[in-house]
Structure formats: structure tokens, C-alpha cells
Amino acid sequence: MVTGVGSGVAQSIIKALKLANQKYKRNYVIIGTDANWKAAGMYAVDKACLVPRCREKSYLQRLIEIIRDNGVAFLIPGTDPELQALSDLKEEIEKETDTHVVLNPPDTIEIGYDKFRTASFLKENGFPYPETVCLVPGESLPEEDQAYPLIVKPRYGSGSVGLSLITGPAQIGNHLAMYDEEMVAQEYINAPQQEFTCGLAFGKDGELLSTIILQRDLKKGFTQFARVARQPEVQRQILDIAGVLEGRGAYNIQGQLTDRGFVVFEINPRFSGTTAFRAVAGQNEPDMYIQHFLNRTVPTPEINQSLCMSRYLNEYYFDTDTADALRQGESRTAGRAGFVMDYF
């Protein structure tokens, strides 16, 4: 079961699982959940179930109901808010059902989710890091930390929400006034042509199964173009970071290669929005984790080192009866309820 299937991360996980069905003859039956019946992923799974938002009291009971009704073996969070919520609920879900919640340990999730702790973790372990300070609501950035340009983003971030490049004091004041939450001001690492996102696939006991490095171009915080990259210096550093972190499933590490080394600014303790691309390249992280958990042999993947990817906008089509049923809370079965036009 994949949660939050309206998100790009969840949809990428679904694509990877479907690719495993095609390429490796798996028999994964994919159940998707979301609080929004309009979410495209609700029409791309084998069964779709409407759920409350993850901070609502009824969320846990609804998940348990779906898991029991469908014999769910693995539960994979597809959004950052659900990553946090399911970290708190994991023990109870696994006690009440036979499912396994695919999550990293709580402390490592917190290291990734708290952007100040991310920088502190890197600093404490001797890795290159961006200078980072906390900004409490109502307080201004200390003058000694005003080295512009700089990045300002929520301390407890979700993707690129709230992130902004700040070029001067007036701009930072206006930006902070928009948010009633803790923020961080972070050193701007200006090496956009040397930006990499790195995938680390972990097994059930923390074994590092494989790594992949992608060089990417961003637009509004999202990967628009990516290519598999050979970067020995980046590879060495992510292996060193993996040796300190305790991983389960996947980590996504983002940073830029500079004269100081590979400066990491994001450690996302979850599957990534580029999970599907990685699967096509040879590293299918959701499938690798599931097979390893089931005590099956997971061979070292052969990565297609020449693969590139460019994203484009697409649509998912479905009929009004299907949409109305989901809107009213009915679970949809009978395979995929929608389709993508084969334009190309």
C-alpha cells in the first residue's frame, strides 16, 4: 500500500512497483490512499481508498481497516507529512496488523525532516555542510549572519515549500512575515551545474544494498532533467554518510560539488520523486527492499550509466462514475480505473 498517491514521490513509487511487475514478473497488487479523491494516483493503482488527513484522529483506524480488509503486506508512505505521522504510528500499526511499515528509524527521520538538525548532523560528523541558523517567528536575522545571497526555508520542511533565494535585508523581512513558523537561513551554495541527488537503497537490517548518483536540473524545486552520473568524490561521501546513518528502505541525499567537497543540504529519509527514473536505470529501490525483507536474493543492480531523463506534463483520464464513487468514499477495485493516452 502506498499512501498520499497525489504526490510525485508516491506516483514514482507506484511506477517502480509496476515496472518490477513487468521486468521481474512480480505480482505486486498496489493499493493507493489519499485524502483527495481527485489525486491522479487514485486512478493508477489496483485499488484506491479515500482516507482522512494524517493528523486527523480517524486516520489510524482507517488505515488499519484498509490493511486488514486487503491483507496489506507492506505500507510505504508517499508524502512527508505521512512520513512523520506513520513514524509515530508504526508500532501500533504493526502490532494490530500483519503489515510492515517501510520507514527509517525515528531519529534519522528527524535528522532529515529538521533542516537545522541536518546541518548540525553533517557538521558534527565532519562532513562539508552549509552554514545554517534558526529563525524564530518575530525575530530578525542577526547582522553577523547576513551574508547574501542566502536560502531561507522552513525548519521542518516538505520538499521545496516555502524555500526562497534571498538577496537582501528587505527581502528577508518580507519573506519571514509570510510564515508563522521556525525557519532556517542557509548559506547559498552556487554550483547549479554540479548539483546531484543520490539514492541509497537499504535492506531490512540496515545493509546498504546499492547507490546511484544523478546529476539534475531543477525548476521550482523539482527535477526537470536528470542523468546518471559517475562521481567518485560524491560516491565516497554518500557512503561515509550511509555509514553513520541507520537506513531502512531508502535515503535521498542532495547537494552540490564545490571546492569544499560535496556540500549536502538535504537528507530525505524516504523514497524520492526520482524513484521511477532510478528503477528504469536499474536500481529499483522499493522492489529491492521488499525482496530483501522477504529473504530473497537481491543482486547488485547493473546501472545504465548513459541514461538521461527529461520530465514533461501528462494527464490521467477516467470516467465520472469512477470519480463520483471515490468522492463518496467507495474503494475502487477492478484494476486501474483510468488510462494515459499513448501520444508518443
Task: Outline where the language-model segments fall.
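ATP-dependent carboxylate activation and anion-phosphoryl transfer catalytic cores
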Residues: N70, P232-F344
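Short, hydrophobic beta-strand segments that form beta-sheet elements in well-ordered domains
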Residues: V29-D34, T132-V133, I166
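Short loop/helix-cap segments at secondary-structure boundaries that form the rim of catalytic
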Residues: A39-V45, L141-Q146, H175-M178
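Phosphate-binding site of ATP-dependent enzymes
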Residues: S164-E246, Q256-L257, G261-V263
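A conserved helix-loop-beta module that forms one wall/lid of the active-site cleft
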Residues: K95-G162
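ATP-binding N-terminal substructure of ATP-dependent carboxylate-amine bond-forming enzymes
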Residues: M1-V102
